[in-house]
Amino acid sequence: MEKFKAAMLLGTVGDALGYGNVCRENSASGSIQEELQKTRGLDSLVLSPGKWPVSDNTIMHMATAEALTTDYWCLDDLYREMVKRYVETVEKLSEHRPDPSTIEGCSQLKPDNYLLAWHTPFSEKGSGFGAATKAMCIGMRYWKPERLETLIEVSIECGRMTHNHPTGFLGSLCTALFASYAIQGKSLVQWGRDMLKVLPLAEEYCRKSIRHMAEYQEHWFYFEAKWQFYLEERKIREDSEVTAVFPDNYDAEERDKTYKKWSSEGRGGRRGHDAPMIAYDALLASGSSWTELCQRAMFHRGESGATGTIAGCLFGLLHGLATVPPGLYQELEHKGRLEDLGTALHRLSTEEK
């Protein structure tokens, strides 16, 4: 249970640090890196809500978790609950620098339409990271191997509500799967290739549930191809490959170049394929070092709030809070609610539903 609570907290810590990093990059006050060099680094930092607010990544992840912890009778009821919470949430997001595709996706939701509440049209603009950053809790809720079918369905439908584009909603499947793998205790190097093995099941589900699959088809293989190239680059594509290989020189500047290369928009972590990819890469390189994870996932020149949210949550599931400076989470915005959601997700995940 403690790691479930840690996951909800550290996803939010990663968001606050990464979001703060983006905000400081866009201001005259200098980067977080410069700020930390003047003090004792992360150990001296206190993430108070006034100075370190969270972004829409946290708000939407909490909305997903709150829906998952209600007493729904069937998945359709769960989806209606998600729609209701997303629509309520998005009205309050203006001060949180929301992902534009999240706003646009939520505008298509119909909470008052019982039958069609969560059915949204295909969107060319729905490829952003926002589906991936709100879905880790789905993997926490349905982490058991025998719940894989449910995890696939819920993560895809949750993703499609706001990001109805394969690059977007496959991002939510990816982060949900990674959360489930962390809880199952799977080796980190397996996660990427095991996720790729699930994609045919996801495609089969979509063929059955999406009426006009043709318009999705041309975009479907982009996500898969990007991940295949990534795993080959790190030499962990095959089951026999057990150690990720990184370049000899992989400092902050080189990482930013690499993150841009993985992106299709020149800004690392902007879309549903590369936000989880950067988080995963950071986890592979960091081991149990929280400081190293922050350097790689929270303090780069891309969408560091998105990658920080995903990486922080998964780190919590893998390692808990032991190596994380307490100042980062003791005064964190929404701390009590986040811990309660972690507790509830743990309890419900051990019960059958």
UniProtKB/Swiss-Prot annotation:
GO cellular component terms, A-Z: sarcomere
Superkingdom as given in the UniProt entry: Eukaryota
Keywords: Cytoplasm, Phosphoprotein
SUPFAM superfamilies recorded: ADP-ribosylglycohydrolase
Main location: cytoplasm
InterPro entries recorded: ADP-ribosylarg_hydro, ADP-ribosylglycohydrolase, Ribosyl_crysJ1, Ribosyl_crysJ1_sf
GO biological process, one term: cardiac chamber ballooning
GO molecular function, one term: ADP-ribosylarginine hydrolase activity
Chain positions with Phosphoserine modification: S27
Cell location: Cytoplasm, Myofibril, Sarcomere
Pfam families reported in the protein's UniProt record: ADP_ribosyl_GH
Physiological role: Required for myofibril assembly and outgrowth of the cardiac chambers in the developing heart. Appears to be catalytically inactive, showing no activity against O-acetyl-ADP-ribose.
Family classification: Belongs to the ADP-ribosylglycohydrolase family.
The name this protein goes by in its record: Inactive ADP-ribosyltransferase ARH2
Organism per entry: Rattus norvegicus (Rat)
